[in-house]
Amino acid sequence: MRAYTAGTRWVWLDLDDTLIDFRANSLESLRLTYADCHLDRYFSSYGRWIKSYLHHNHDLWERYNRAEITQDYLRMHRFLDPIREHVPDMSEEEFAPEARSMDTIYLDHLARQKCMIDGAMELVRHLRAHAYNIGILSNGFTDVQHRKIHTVGLDTLIDLIGLSDDIGI
């Protein structure tokens, strides 16, 4: 590795898709959620469900990042909207408890996944070995991000975690 700028004390890294392979972990968690929640009741295949889920989830995150919706709305509707798209006669009130349960199941699976970006752990260990303070930044949900950091073993290597939830953005 190249020498670092003299006087640099902190290195800040994004968590998802820089250190942790969010996409791989999320897809595995969604596959497990599909099976655990028996979503084949509503969809003819996992492929149809995941396509609908990813479309709605992307739109909801865009709206959340613009502060147009709340975290609670995002977490429920990313599961509710794909199902209502395929089962239009189902009311929000009828499915809301199941959608909330699905979100909990998904986030629990997500927090347990261990797939990291190639070379990420080596980078963090290298920085730690050279006495750099390491901070992690993320826009993920506080409880899940802390669990993910612990699951992959980063919690013993970092000094500070800055989460958008914690600072109100």
PLM feature spans:
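Substrate-recognition "cap/lid" segment bordering the active-site pocket of phosphatases
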Residues: 108, 112-115, 121, 135, ...
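Hydrophobic (often cysteine-bearing) scaffold residues that line and stabilize catalytic clefts
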Residues: 22, 26, 71, 75, ...
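Active-site neighborhood of HAD-like aspartate-dependent phosphohydrolases
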Residues: 2-55
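A metal-dependent, Asp-based hydrolase signature
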Residues: 36, 55-105
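Class I S-adenosyl-L-methionine
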Residues: 31-35, 80, 84, 125-128, ...
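Short, acidic loop-to-helix structural element flanking the phosphoryl-transfer center
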Residues: 7, 12, 72-73, 92-100, ...
